[in-house]
Amino acid sequence: IHDVYEGPNGVKLNFYYKNDPKIIENWKAVQPVTAELMEFFNDNIGVYPYKQYSVVQGGDGGMEYSMLTLVNYGDEFVPLVSVTSHELAHAWFQGVLATNEMNHEWMDEGAASFFGDLAESFVLGSNFNNSIRSSYARYISLANSGQEMPQSTNANRYKYNRAYESTAYSKGFVFLSQLRYIIGLDAFNETIKNYYNTYKFTHPLPNDLRRIAEQSSGILLNWYLTDWTQTTNKINYAINQVEQSKNKSKITLERIGLMPMPLEVLVKYKDGTEEFYYIPISLMRGEKKQPSYAKSWTQVKDWSWAYKKYTFEVNSRLEYIKSIDINPTGL
C-alpha cells in the first residue's frame, strides 16, 4: 500500500507498507503523527529542507537514510511512533548536519535519541523525564561495567558491541540532557537552532557544537566536552558534612568522581519552604539563569575544580532543615 500525506510546508510524506490487516490501522494512524513530528523538529531544530520524506515498512527494526526510513513495525502503535520519531530525527542530524558517523557517532545517534524521544513525548503526551532516566540508567550500567571506552573512540574500534551502542545512543543522549542542565533550557534551545542553521550541510565537529553553545549561553564548555567525550571520568558528588555555625548551617560537599559539574542543591525547611543553592564551577567562567522550576535561587561562589571539597552556608539553623538534596530534578 502507498499512502501520501501532506506534511508541514507542503512536504510530501509517503508511506509504503504491506497489505496486512494486522498493521493497516496503525500505519494509517501514524501518518498524521509523522506530520506532527516533522513540525516539532522544524520548530525545535530547524526547517526540513526537502520536498518529500518516505516511511517504508521493511528492514530490521529501524534504519535511517536521506529522505527515507525503513521501519519494521506495525502490530503496536506506540512502538511504531517511537521508531518513526527516532529515525525521522536522523533527517536533521544525519541527513542535513551529516556529522562523521565513524568518528562522532554520538552526535547523530545521541541527538536522534534525545529529540526523537522529546518529539514523541510531545505528540503522545508521555513523560520525557522517563526517557532521561532510562538513558541515564543505560549509561550508568555501562560506566559501572568496566567495558566503557571514551566517546571519541572510532565506531569500529570499540571492544564490545554494547559499549558502542550505549556510548552512541545513551551517553550521547545524556550529553545533550546535561548540556541543557548546565546552560539552561532557553540557551539550550537557542544552541540547537543556531547549530543547525549555522552548520547544515557542512559536517560539523564536536567543537562546532561547543562554540555555538558557548555563544548562546555565555558559559565556557571546553571542560565539559573534553571530560565527557575524551575520557571515562565519572560525575559523582556527595554531602560530606552538615554542621551548625552560630545561627547558620554549613554544608560541605565532596566530589568523588573525577569529572566536575555545576551543582544545584535543594534545601527544604520544616516550615514547608525550600531554596535552591546554585554552585557554578570556575571552569565555566559564567553561570546559567534561574530555571523556572526553582522558586528560590541563590548563587554562591564558584567551586574550583581542583578542590575535592566545598563548603557553603545556609541562613538557617540546622534544626529547621528538613532535607538536603544534590540535583533533585535528576535531569
Mark where each language-model region is.
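Generic, well-ordered alpha-helical scaffold segments in large soluble proteins
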Residues: V33-N44, G74, V83, E87-A91, ...
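Acidic/His/Gly-enriched intrinsically disordered linker/tail segments
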Residues: E109-V174, Q178, I182, Y199
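Hydrophobic helix-coil surface modules that form long, contiguous segments used
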Residues: I1-S85, F114-D117
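Loop/turn elements at helix/coil->beta-strand transitions in domains of secreted/extracellular proteins
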Residues: G10-K12, V47-Y53, A89, I183-F188, ...
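Beta-strand-rich binding/interaction modules
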Residues: N222, I235-N327
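Amphipathic alpha-helical substructures
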Residues: E165-I251, E275
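Zinc-dependent metallopeptidase catalytic helix centered on the HExxH motif
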Residues: L70-S134
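Second-shell loop/turn segments in exported
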Residues: N19-A29, L70, E101-M102, R162-E165, ...
